[in-house]
Structure formats: C-alpha cells, structure tokens
Amino acid sequence: MEFNKARNIIGLRVLSDNVIWLMAKDKSVVVIDPSVHEPVIRYINENNFHLEAILQTHHHSDHIGGTKSLIEKWPNVKVIASSKEKKRIPFQNVSVEDGETLNILGEEVKIIEVLGHTSSHIAFFLNGENPVLFIGDTLFSGGCGRIFEGTYQQMYSSLERIKSLPKNTLIYCAHEYTKANILWALNLKPKDQDIKNKLSEVEKKLSLNELTIPFLLDEEMKINLFLRAKNLEEFTFLRANKDLWV
C-alpha cells in the first residue's frame, strides 16, 4: 500500500503488476480502474469510507474486473467511463466525452481523451496547486502503452497532449513497469546519464519494496524516450522497437 498525503491517494498492489488507485476526501472515496474487488472492499471497510465513484480509463479486463462486484456492494456508486465504451463497459452510468468536466470529491476533474492503447481510452485530470493525472495504460514511467486498437498517430498525439499539462503534474499509471522500461531505454541510449540515474533510483525503491509510481511529468520528460520523440517517425520507430524487446 502506497500513499500520497497531499491528496490522500492510496495505491493497492494487485495481480502481477497492477496498481489500483483510490482517492479519498473526508469519508468518501473514488477508485480508479479496479481490476479486482476484494482488496478495494477491504480497504474501504477498514477505513469506514463510502464509495462515491469508480473511474474507468478503458475496457481491458485488468481494469474493470472488479467493478461489477463493487456495484453489487454499493448499488448507487457512479461508474464513470467514455461514452464510446457503452458496449464494452455496459455498467457505466455516467458517460463522458473529451473535454468534459465533472465534480468528484468536491474537485473539478477534466476528461482527456488519450487514444492509442485502445480506441476510446480516457484520462482523468485534476488541476490546481498539486495537479494529478490518472492515465491508465497510455503512459508509464519510461514507457507508453502498446497500441492495440488505435494508431501510432493517435498515441503520439495523446503523448503530446500529456506533455502540454503543467510540468508538476503527478501521473498515476496502472502498472509497475518502470524497471523493464528503463532497461529498454538504456539499451538504446547506454550513455544517457538521466536514464542511468533513473535506473539507480528505481532499483533503490524496488529494493525497499516501494512503488516507482506515480511520477512527475517534468522528470519523466527527461527520461522517457517516447516523450522525447521529436516527430511521429521517431515515435513509431521507438514503439516498434519496444514491441520486440524481451
């Protein structure tokens, strides 16, 4: 379990490498991409929270696998997902579109469409003094999501959108992939000191059984080769290369 005390965001490690994020305020909590339900229910009950909403970035089973059971336990919970995902996330009851804003836990949350990994992937952005982005599988520390349904152009454009956000944005992705991503980047850029430093930082955190996520956008732009790509051609080469990395 990991904490961000500035916004009371909690990370639950589940499955092999998933992280379920929960954000609490007073006695209400929202959960992002619940791949399973048991640890979420346990945490909510232990802390006497009320589940206000479930935020779904996309339809993959390791992101929605626990949602139905959470709905059974809290029938009035809001399930927020892309309006384009009504067939694949049929239990959504708040359908949203790119650019729309919602009030969640008393804060304004903006919907940002980040296509590429899937054809209707969205992210949830909270602005302010300590901006936060729940990005699902579009961006990882040192990497980006595989392109399953979208196009290279869509993913590249999505990353450009992310880069335009405030540089102090803290980014919450849904998987602990950092070390593998950094090792791949070092294979391509073996003399890059920023990436070398990142690997040392990551290995230290992992040795202490700590998560390497979330991560700051400003720092990520220095070490993430996908964010450093100058054009679509360079991005396409990098993504194709990463797909072959073992």
Swiss-Prot record:
Transmembrane segments: none annotated. Gene3D superfamilies: Ribonuclease Z/Hydroxyacylglutathione hydrolase-like. Zn(2+) 1 binds at residues 58, 60, 117, 137. It comes from the Bacteria. InterPro entries: Clx_II_MBL, Glyoxalase_II_hydrolase, HAGH_C, Hydroxyacylglutathione_Hdrlase, Metallo-B-lactamas, RibonucZ/Hydroxyglut_hydro. Binds 2 Zn(2+) ions per subunit. Its cofactor is Zn(2+). Monomer. Thiolesterase that catalyzes the hydrolysis of S-D-lactoyl-glutathione to form glutathione and D-lactic acid. This is Hydroxyacylglutathione hydrolase. It comes from Prochlorococcus marinus (strain AS9601). The gene is gloB.
